[in-house]
Design a protein with these regions (language model features):
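Catalytic phosphate/metal-binding cores of nucleic-acid and nucleotide-processing enzymes, i.e., regions
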Residues: 3-135
Length: 137
């Protein structure tokens, strides 16, 4: 396990609870507690409302206090609602960590838990996810 020389939450644009939840998720990823079948950067939650991506897991481990999710109505009256954070309220660097706003074919959406751990550690340490480096592993 690497020593933690993380930037302060305020430097990262995070609240204390958001920071603490991301540190907890990092530990879970590095210990292999979040498996491939439980992780995808393509969505915040799986259709069954279990956590999926870094943002979803941070929300989950903080019992909903970090990156609070709000209901997003379905596209039609027959569509189910989805849940997501207030993306517009997040700093750019946090959006980049979560892979928000990318093209559906961006490699970040295929990241493994190990690659996500590398990007998350980079974000907490340097203030940038550095996905290209993480995905090269």
């Amino acid at each position: 396990m690497l020593a933690n020389n993380f930037l302060p939450p305020s430097t990262l644009g995070l609240s204390d609870v958001e920071f603490e939840s991301l540190v907890k998720v990092l530990g879970m990823l590095e210990r292999g507690e979040i498996g491939d079948d439980q992780f995808t950067m393509r969505r915040v939650q799986h259709p069954c409302r279990t956590p999926a991506c870094l943002c979803g897991w941070a929300n989950h481990v903080s019992t909903g206090r970090a990156f609070q999710l709000e209901e997003k109505p379905g596209l039609t009256i027959f569509s189910k609602s989805t849940y997501g954070p207030r993306w517009r309220a997040m700093p750019r660097r946090v959006l980049e960590l979560f892979g928000y706003g990318g093209r559906p074919t961006d490699p970040v959406y295929l990241a493994t838990p190990s690659q996500a751990a590398t990007a998350l550690r980079s974000f907490l340490t340097h203030g940038e996810a550095r996905w290209a480096e993480a995905l090269a592993d």
